[in-house]
């Protein structure tokens, strides 16, 4: 695993964070050291796939990055005629994802596409994964995407939505942000790295509250919506059609 040192030296002109070649190269290390509970979420996606994925259906991993969630789901699917479609708009991520998936043999076909998830049809789905993806979409596009997902899910299908959250109580919000930064420092990131990455993400990652997520998912039509995992200001929800 290549170590993430992208923000370890001062950057004179710090632009917006993008999922380019450099990020794709170090992404597994970056996300493990940056997202509290990430491994637990990936493992549980497999457990949810085992329960929810049905025969003759599709599984979508929207914003699949290097394929961790896709592989976790695939390892735990025991139904016939299932196909997994992973989609990411970063070509470097897609190339590495394809290599990663190909390294593990399975009877379940996986197709990895380089595309904008807003422009991809969702159909005959028993499971859709949005693992730290929605937060990078413009807020005005989120309802349309979730509506498309809901309409493309079969009855009793599940959406797994993992996100970084903001909290309406300012003191709690600041506390959890501080704890997250402490988590990153404990994982070897310097103050400079934490600060520069936060600045780079400011304009591209817009977080919502748990309440906002729940209300939006209910309004789209999901019958059951629940937060099943949280660590500091990161967490994951399930929404069942």
Curated annotation (Swiss-Prot):
Instruction: Give the transmembrane region(s).
Output: none
What is the catalytic activity of this protein? prephenate + S-adenosyl-L-methionine = carboxy-S-adenosyl-L-methionine + 3-phenylpyruvate + H2O
* Subunit: Homodimer.
What family is it from? Belongs to the class I-like SAM-binding methyltransferase superfamily. Cx-SAM synthase family.
Source species of the chain: Haemophilus influenzae (strain PittGG)
Protein function? Catalyzes the conversion of S-adenosyl-L-methionine (SAM) to carboxy-S-adenosyl-L-methionine (Cx-SAM).
Q: What class of enzyme is it?
A: transferase
**What are the entry keywords?**
S-adenosyl-L-methionine, Transferase
Q: Listed GO molecular functions?
A: carboxyl- or carbamoyltransferase activity; S-adenosyl-L-methionine binding
One of its GO biological process terms is: tRNA wobble uridine modification
- Protein name as catalogued: Carboxy-S-adenosyl-L-methionine synthase
Record keyword Oxidoreductase present: no
Q: Which domain of life is it from?
A: Bacteria
Keyword check for S-adenosyl-L-methionine, yes or no: yes
Please state the Enzyme Commission number of this protein.
Answer: 2.1.3.-
Which of this chain's residues are annotated to bind S-adenosyl-L-methionine? Answer: 38, 63-65, 88-89, 116-117, 131, 198
Q: Tell me which PANTHER family the record gives.
A: CARBOXY-S-ADENOSYL-L-METHIONINE SYNTHASE (PTHR43861:SF2), TRANS-ACONITATE 2-METHYLTRANSFERASE-RELATED (PTHR43861)
Cited SUPFAM superfamilies: S-adenosyl-L-methionine-dependent methyltransferases
């Amino acid at each position: 695993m290549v170590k993430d040192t992208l923000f370890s030296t001062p950057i004179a002109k710090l632009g917006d964070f993008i999922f380019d070649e450099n990020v794709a190269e170090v992404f597994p290390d970056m996300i493990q050291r940056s997202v509290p509970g990430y491994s637990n979420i990936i493992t549980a996606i497999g457990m949810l796939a085992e329960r929810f994925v049905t025969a003759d259906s599709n599984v979508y991993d929207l914003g699949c990055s290097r394929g961790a969630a896709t592989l976790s789901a695939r390892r735990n699917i025991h139904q016939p005629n299932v196909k997994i479609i992973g989609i990411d708009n970063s070509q470097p991520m897609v190339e590495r994802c394809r290599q990663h998936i190909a390294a593990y043999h399975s009877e379940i076909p996986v197709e990895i596409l380089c595309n904008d998830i807003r422009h991809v049809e969702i159909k005959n789905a028993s499971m859709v994964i949005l693992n730290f993806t929605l937060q990078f979409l413009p807020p005005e596009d989120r309802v349309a995407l979730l509506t498309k997902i809901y309409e493309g899910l079969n009855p009793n299908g599940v959406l797994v939505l993992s996100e970084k959250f903001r909290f309406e109580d300012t003191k709690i919000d600041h506390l959890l942000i501080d704890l997250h930064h402490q988590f990153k420092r404990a994982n070897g990131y310097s103050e400079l790295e934490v600060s520069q990455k936060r600045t780079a993400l400011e304009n591209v990652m817009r977080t919502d509250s748990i309440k906002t997520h729940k209300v939006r998912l209910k309004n789209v039509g999901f019958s059951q919506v629940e937060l099943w995992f949280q660590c500091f200001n990161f967490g994951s929800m399930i929404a069942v059609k």
